[in-house]
Structures are given as structure tokens and as C-alpha cells.
Amino acid sequence: MSDLFEDPAPSRNTPEFTVSELSGAVKRVIEGEFGLVRVRGEIGRVSRPASGHLYFDLKDDRAVMAAICWKGQAGRLSVRPEEGMEVVATGRMTTFPGQSKYQIIVEDMAPAGAGALMAMLEKRRAALAAEGLFDAARKHPLPFLPRVIGVVTSPSGAVIRDILHRLRDRFPSHVLIWPVAVQGEKCAPEVAAAIRGFNALPEGGPIPRPDLLIVARGGGSLEDLWGFNEEIVVRAAAESRIPLISAVGHETDTTLIDHAADRRAPTPTAAAEMAVPVRLELLAGLDGQVARLSRCAAETIRRRDQRLRDLARALPRLESLVAGPSQRFDLWSGRLSGALGQSVAARRARLEPLGAHLRPRLLADLVARQKDRLGDRTRSLETCLGRRAERARDRFDALSARLAPAFARLIAETERATRRDAATLGTLAARLDAAPEARLARLSDRLEALDRLRQTLGYRETLKRGYAVVRADGAVLTTKAEAGAAAMLEIEFQDGRLSVGRGKTRKPKEEPPAQGSLL
């Protein structure tokens, strides 16, 4: 019975290992048997320590495997590992003897199918929308007529050719192309750098700053367009101070940059159509506005002129206004002559008695006294004026000393302004002199073109090709009946005219009777 509870003695032929030796042997077997493998599973328990390495689990409904992605490789992963995401990890199997567990060193990672990509895309879209990156309040209006357009796309391919062709057809503009990769690992960082690079250009620098940006790419699968779903691209588009049009893929393709852009275009060609209007339509609209303005101005002038005529007819005639005052003037002028004579006679009669009382001596004394008083006043006034003039001269000298620098600056500024105005006037004069000559040249070219068209469409060019014009009594004949009724015909050829008299009408030759049938 005791044998049932005792372990059998180990065989002396079984090899003996230390723990380290056995762990190393297991490590060599696993690394040799499972070199490079691809493992599909759900990510769980993601850890990102300060070292930069990435630790997580790959699991399914029956097993869990530890996974490691070193710092240098973690930054190059196309997918950012998140808990709950289903992925396919590519890497090499190994063991960690310190904890007696096996694990996979991940070198690459991709979502497990389109469903996983769509789930990750929706989760990322919701997170970015919660931050307000897709709010309508952040959108910028597109400029009506941008001078410079920046295009972020691949420099080769049909996309850039379609955009340039459409811009050239609608309204030629200055286009700056920032070449980027439009798929793959380099796509997202290069597109984000291009958007930020255009925004960093200074106003008035050697490279003109665009007024509008177009981010464009042709159609493709969800994986091909994934670079435009990356968070770095979406944030760069949302932060752009320059209005941005997203034209990624076809009309059915939707990426996250479409939500962050100020406007989404279904195709790159449509983006070019959104960017600029049609130049010919603008010119036609401008011509229509000018024509309407001219008609409105002419109608306004006509109505004002008619109103003036109506008011003029309502006013009284000038002769009727002047007739009454003129008659009164004649009446009063006759009366005034007699009244003046009577007034002079009455005043002379009053002055004659007074003149007898006036003596020359009294007048001379009065004049002498007034002259002495005037001399005293003059001397006093001269003294006072001298003192006031001296004080005024002192104040004037002080003010002159204070105002001299200001006058000097004013004179200098006036001279500079005069030189600038003279330069501006010279430029305007040159432009004014050149404008009539340019207009005269354009009108001359148009006149020559119309003259060539007149010569081409004239009937004399037709005569050179063998035709002739038939006239009778100065009128052109167009039918056989008119020619038969005319007595004299005049035929015009290329080199002159020929008169032809009507000859004797020949009787048409009768056709022989048809031979009857012998049967």
C-alpha cells in the first residue's frame, strides 16, 4: 500500500537542467520555430511608460498573449493601439525568462479588416468632434477671387493636371504647389507640414502667402485614404487661418479632413471650380451692369431735362417782370430831377444869411488851435507807438526763435511732399500719355480686322472665283424670267462690265416623235 503514496525514483538517463538553461532552451525553440508571425486579436491593457516602449495584450475568447513594441518602432506604427481595437500584429515570438512567459515583439500593426477601420474612424471622429474641431463657427468663408492658391497634393498624376487645367479655363491664378505623399506612412506628416507651412508664410515675403488652400487626392480604398483620417492632419486643417478646401477621393469617399476643412469638394476638379469664378461670366455681368447704369443715367438726365422744361414754361416771361419796375423808374427819375433842383435852391437860401456872420480870422484861429492840439496828440501817439513797437519787436524775436525749428521742419516736409507729388504726377502723366496711344492702337487693329472681314464677305471676292453679276436697267437680275424680259443686259466680271444686246429668240428644236412599237 505504501508504494501508492511514494514517487518513483527518477531515471538516471533523464538529463538535468538548471532553470536558466531550461529557459534558454525554450527561448531558442520558440524563436527558431516561430520566427516572423502574424497574430490577430483584440488589444487589451495598454501601457505606455516613460521609456517610450509600448506594452499591451493580444487576446481572444480563449487565450491572452503579451506584446511589446519598442520605442523606435512604436512611433512608426500606422495605427495607434487603443484598448478594445481588433488588429493584426506582425512580429517575432520570444520569451521573457525573468517571468517565465512568452511574448511577441511587434514590428507592424494594422486594423483587422474594414470593419475595424470604420469603428476606429468613427471613434476618432466622435472624439475630435467633441473638441469642437468640426464646428461651423470655426469655418472661414472662401475668398471671392483669390490672387494666390496653394495646392497640397502629389506633383505627379492627373489630380494636379485637372486642377491647373480647370483654373486656367475659369480664371487664371497664381498657383503654389506643395508636393506631398498622398498615401502611406509619410502621407499624414507631410500633408500636415504643408498646411502649417503655407500658414507660416509671412505677408509680403519673397514667397507669396496663399489666399486659399486646396488639399487634393484622387480616389482610392479606405486604406489608401487613411492618411487623411489621421489626427495630425485634421488638427492642421482645423487650425489653418487660410480658408481650406478638401478634395480627397471621389464624391462617395469621406475622410476626417472633410469635416475640419472650410469647404468639401466632391472631386479635385470641383475644388478648382469652387476656388475661382468664371472670368467670362464676370466680364459679361460687368458689361451688363455698365449698360444698365448707362441707361439709368440717360433716363435720369432725360427726366431732369423734361422737368426743367416744364418749370421753365411755368415761370413768367422776363419782359412782364421788368415792364412794371421800368415804368416806375422812368416816372421817378423825372420827378427826381425837379426835386434835386428845388432842394439845392432851398439849401442855398438858408446858407446865404449864415455866411454873413462867418469871419476869416475866427476860422484861422480855430484852425490853428486844432492844429496845435493835433500836433500834441501826434507826438504823444508817436511815443506810445514807439514803445509798443519795441515791445512787439521783442515778442516777435522771441517767437521767431521758438518757431524757427518748426518752420524748418515744415519747410523740409513740404519739400518732401512736393517731390513725392511731383513723382506721382509724373507717373500719372506718363500713364495718361500712354492710355490714348494704347486705345488708338486697339481701335486701329479692330478697324483693320473689320476691313479684312468686309473684303472677305464682299461680292467682288466672289467674282474672282468665276461668278458674274447680271444687271438690267441698273437692277440685279436673279431669275431666268427677269433676264428674258430685259432688252439689254449688263454683265459684271472680275475685271469690268460687258453690255450684251438681246438677240433674236431661237425657236426650240422639236424632238423627233418616238418610234412606235412594231407589236
From Swiss-Prot:
Catalytic activity: Exonucleolytic cleavage in either 5'- to 3'- or 3'- to 5'-direction to yield nucleoside 5'-phosphates
Principal location class: cytoplasm
E.C. no: 3.1.11.6
UniProtKB keywords: Cytoplasm, Exonuclease, Hydrolase, Nuclease
Enzyme's top EC category: hydrolase
Pfam family for this entry, one: tRNA_anti_2
GO MF terms held by the record: exodeoxyribonuclease VII activity; nucleic acid binding
Gene Ontology CC: cytoplasm; exodeoxyribonuclease VII complex
Region (Disordered): 500-519
Domain of life: Bacteria
Localization of this protein: Cytoplasm
One Gene Ontology term from the biological process aspect of the record: DNA catabolic process
Oligomeric and partner information: Heterooligomer composed of large and small subunits.
Recorded family membership: Belongs to the XseA family.
Biological role stated in the UniProt entry: Bidirectionally degrades single-stranded DNA into large acid-insoluble oligonucleotides, which are then degraded further into small acid-soluble oligonucleotides.
Protein name as catalogued: Exodeoxyribonuclease 7 large subunit
Organism of provenance: Cereibacter sphaeroides (strain ATCC 17023 / DSM 158 / JCM 6121 / CCUG 31486 / LMG 2827 / NBRC 12203 / NCIMB 8253 / ATH 2.4.1.) (Rhodobacter sphaeroides)
